[in-house]
Amino acid sequence: VAGEFSLGDLAVRFGLLLRGEPDLRVSRVATLSHADAGALSFLANPRYRKQMQATRATVVLVGPDHAADCPVAALIDPNPYLAYARIANLLHPQAPPDAGIHSTAVVAASAHIADSACVGPLAVIEDEAKIGERVFVGPGCIVQRGAHIGADSRLMARVNVCAGVRIGRRCILHAGAVVGADGFGFAPDAGTWVKVPQVGSVQIGDDVEIGANTTIDRGAIDDTVVRHGVKLDNQIQVGHNVTIGAHTAIAGCVGISGSTTIGERCMIGGGVGIAGHLTIADDVVVTGCSLVSASIRNAGSYSSGMPAVETRMWRRMVAHLRRLDGKER
């Protein structure tokens, strides 16, 4: 926690309209239902309005449409969730790593590690790897031969950055992420398979976040590319030679087949499957559990699949479909 901040200071610092006493102070964030004195909360979804009306927070970040319903001090902004994100980063800053290399880490003689970096217990840094300023390499991480980690990036426990991979500045790789494993490339040979060497690498831009147990395969020949500002949730599979455009956000359990290009500022919902060798335009939204089997050339929102219904209803629908099929025959 960074300390206490007055509401007046927060209003000036972040360009917010304050309704309430400017000398009131907050030191932490909390949900509307669990906040107490000294806590800041927010209302971004109207369904939680009743919780706001009963909150004990010192102040609530709220949009203009709901400010009148707030029983405590209000910091008013058209985008309260964005304002909350910025203030939460101020109140709960990421502590800088303690510089140094743990005694149990294994570091190759030819590796270059910045003096301000932190290498945790049982980490392995291989030949010619480069670890930038203020980088945190967590317990059990492996940074393979020739990989580069940009300044201020953080590798949580047991991240594997494979040979030759480039990670940009201010990136966060959560526990168990693997960047640069072999892509799924096999040539059929009379009922068997011959492995195709995966000789490309992976290029990760600046300010990228990669969720726990997400895997990004190295390119077959050219590199797999994740551009600046991309946000990847947990358990995503990114196939070889995929390109993900800047500031695209992808939710958990998405599978992206090889050689597909996703544009900038896209939002991909959880559980989406994307076939290979496709192009998805900038500013596309794909809703959860959809199947993308053809390229999407225009911005907009796209969906497929059927929402869950009661089992009885589902069985009736399937029965109707079967009868329709019988009529066609």
List the model feature ranges, each with a label.
Residues 1-104, 165, 170, 176-177, ...:
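Terminal amphipathic alpha-helical/low-complexity segments used for targeting or macromolecular assembly
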Residues 42, 100-310:
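Structural signal for interior beta-strand "rungs" in well-ordered beta-sheet cores
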